[in-house]
Amino acid sequence: LWQEHDLTQNAVDLIAADQVPESGWKHVLEGLDEDGRTIALVHEDSPALRRMAVFDAIVNNADRKGDHILSLTDGHRHGVDHGLTFHRDHKLRTVLWGWRGDALTADEEDGIDRVSEGLHGDLGRELAGLLSAEEIASLAARCDRLRQAGRFPGPSGEMPAVPWPLF
C-alpha cells in the first residue's frame, strides 16, 4: 500500500517547551536540544492517534517513533510497523504517551473487545500461524489488562519509555 503523506502535517513534533499549544496537542516529555534549549515532545490529540496508541499497547509495540506515523491530507494517520511487536515480555516504547492515565472511550473499549473475542476465532487461527502460543497468550493478557484498567497505560519504569532516536 503506497500512500503519499503530507509533509506539512506532523502528528508528532519537537517544539520549544514554552510553545506547547493549550489544546489539540498532548505533551509527552521535555529535554534539551543540541544548543541547551528546553524542548518538548508533543503529539496531536486526535482520534486517529488514540486508536494507534491503543493498538500499540495491545500489540506491545517496542518502536513507535514519530516518523513511523504518516500524516495524510484527509487527516488519516498510517502507522509504519516493522515487526518489533507481539513479544511476550513487556516492551512498549512509544512517543504516544500523551494519554497515559486517560479513560478509554467506548469505541476504544469495543475495539479491544473485538480483538479479544477474535482470538477465540478467525483472528486466533490466523495468528497461530505467525506467533507462538506464548505470544498469543500475552496478547490476550494485554487486552484483558487494558480493558480492566479502562485507561491508557503509562510507562512501566522497567525500561526506556520512548524509542531512540525519537524520529
Report each predicted region and the residues it spans:
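Phosphate/dinucleotide-binding and metal-coordinating scaffold of catalytic cores
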Residues: 1-167
